[in-house]
Design a protein with these regions (language model features):
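Short glycine-aromatic motifs
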Residues: 26-30, 37, 133-135, 139-140
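Structured extramembrane domains adjacent to transmembrane segments
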Residues: 56-165
């Protein structure tokens, strides 16, 4: 029944939380659950709603961690930031987190969903060509993928970004 589903969702969120928390403490990184237990769901398909006009009150976590204009940021509604891991890896300040938003039918080119975000501080514009799922904004080089953040790939994704700087 519904009770079991809710119980499972809570257990699942707690398990995710522990995975991220353990990874952060193992490597001496900061961890912020942010909106990590906001009834968080794993969307494998695109999520859209038919909403033409939306007034957004930004979550403080979105303001703090996801204050960018380029896709997947700055679009849609119900923007959420969850499970933020931040620190220095090989002397490179970084942040990694799961980002979610609900897309709008009026803008099919920017589908909503769940994104795994890794970004590094990068004071100068990157010298190399960025691939599709990357952008440079506000002194950060950012790369995003579909799905929840996976701790197993954070370091390799940072290494990949470092090569572009």
């Amino acid at each position: 029944g519904v009770g079991w589903v809710v119980f499972w969702a809570i257990k699942h969120a707690q398990k995710n939380n522990m995975t991220y928390k353990n990874f952060a403490s193992e490597h001496g990184y900061e961890f912020d659950q942010a909106q990590g237990n906001d009834n968080y769901r794993d969307y494998s398909t695109n999520v859209t709603r038919n909403e033409k006009t939306v007034t957004l009150s930004q979550s403080p976590f979105v303001e703090k961690y996801a204050n960018f204009t380029q896709y997947p940021f700055g679009h849609g509604t119900e923007r959420k930031v969850a499970y933020v891991i931040s620190g220095d890896y090989k002397n490179t300040p970084f942040q990694a987190f799961t980002y979610h938003f609900v897309g709008q039918d009026s803008d099919k080119s920017k589908p909503g969903g769940v994104f795994s975000i890794v970004l590094i501080q990068c004071p100068d514009t990157p010298r190399r060509q960025l691939t599709d799922q990357m952008f440079y904004e506000n002194g950060f080089l950012c790369e995003y993928q579909q799905g929840n953040l996976n701790v197993e790939t954070i370091h390799e994704r940072i290494d990949h970004l470092r090569k572009l700087v």
